[in-house]
Amino acid sequence: MKADYNTYYYIAASKHFLTQEEPLEEILREKTEHFIANNKSIDFWIFDSTKLNAHSPNEIKTLQKTFFFPTILIISSNKKFITWLKLRLRYIFTDKIQLAIKL
């Protein structure tokens, strides 16, 4: 039986950059408030490479291993949101990933 894959878009950057040099917490808090105020479901997930465990998706663990430093990934099914984050944060990596699970 062939697995169904879901396409997600993501940004990746060093944990230090996103938590110390950029106001990531503030950006995501404002975006979350916007989603709630507009009755939209929150469709992004944050993965910290230093906190992955046995329950983390294998594709995410494999992706995190491609970076040589503690990394944060923000994953969403909404490509426009990821593009907005890229424009807002600038010095980050973006791409897409196919996951066999639905986040």
Swiss-Prot record:
Q: Name one Pfam family in it.
A: Ycf54
Coarse class of the primary localization is plastid
This entry carries the following GO cellular component terms, namely: chloroplast
Q: Does the keyword Nucleus apply?
A: no
Keywords on record: Chloroplast, Plastid
Q: Where in the cell is it found?
A: Plastid, Chloroplast
PANTHER family named among the record's database cross-references: PTHR35319, YCF54
Query: So what family is this one in?
Result: Belongs to the ycf54 family.
**Name of the molecule in the record:** Uncharacterized protein ycf54
